[in-house]
Regions:
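Short, conserved glycine- and acidic-residue-centered signature motifs
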Residues: 33-36, 59, 78, 155
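Positions that flank functional sites
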Residues: 9, 78-79, 178
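Flexible gly/pro-rich beta->alpha loop and the following alpha-helix that scaffold active-site loops
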Residues: 1-54, 67
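Pocket-forming structural segment of enzyme catalytic cores
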Residues: 20-21, 41-48, 54, 61-153, ...
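Acyltransferase
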Residues: 150-194
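Short glycine-rich anion-binding loops that position phosphate/pyrophosphate groups of nucleotides
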Residues: 28-33, 59-61, 147-148
């Protein structure tokens, strides 16, 4: 694994210095994705469809704006607080129980009514704030909360799910989008708009 600051190099340098990259994680950071994300958005645009991409916090926001959605005030400021996460049981969430605790550090979120058709909501808070997005065709997943936080549940399983993917298109990974049986009671109803 190599950690690279998004403002430390250009996309061309990233491609030249890491020609065999197998996965891309766009990690958290302060600010707004349109002003403060370095090469994150161009990297998403370039690598989408080639390798799996995971966005965390600002990473979700970068994915949102890359595909034409809007990131705006979430309506609440949460820093270091946990919320139950209602999810679809697929992709990153495969094998996770409903209501898994997610640690949140954000004041911005994807505006639900701005999302393009290519992105689907995969998880929400009980109050309806978007906590996860997935590209419908490309292996691009994201969460607004921090699965790597000590206060979040099942972060290791989510990372294992992501690292198990070896393609850039969901059509090449059909099992990834098949829910893991009994772990997802009434997933469709839990993701209905609040």
């Amino acid at each position: 694994m190599t950690v690279i600051r998004s403002e430390a190099l250009t996309l061309e340098q990233l491609k030249a210095e890491h020609p065999t990259m197998t996965h891309l994680i766009i990690s958290p950071g302060p600010g707004h994705p349109l002003k403060d994300s370095g090469i994150s958005i161009p990297a998403i645009d370039y690598y989408a469809g080639k390798i799996p991409i995971l966005g965390v916090c600002m990473g979700l926001q970068c994915i949102t704006v890359n595909y034409g959605g809007i990131v705006d005030q979430a309506g609440e400021y949460v820093h270091g607080k946990t919320s139950p996460i209602l999810h679809d049981g697929k992709g990153l969430f495969k094998g996770l129980q409903q209501g898994v605790a997610g640690t949140r550090y954000h004041s911005l979120a994807a505006r639900i009514n701005s999302l393009p058709d290519c992105l689907e909501v995969t998880s929400r808070t009980e109050g309806g704030i978007v906590m996860g997005l997935r590209h419908r065709d490309l292996v691009v997943e994201s969460v607004q909360y921090h699965p790597e936080s000590i206060l979040s549940d099942e972060g290791k399983l989510m990372l294992a799910n992501f690292l198990s993917w070896n393609a850039g298109k969901w059509s090449d990974l059909p099992d990834a989008l098949t829910p893991a049986g009994s772990h997802v009671p009434h997933a469709a109803s839990t993701l209905a708009p609040a």
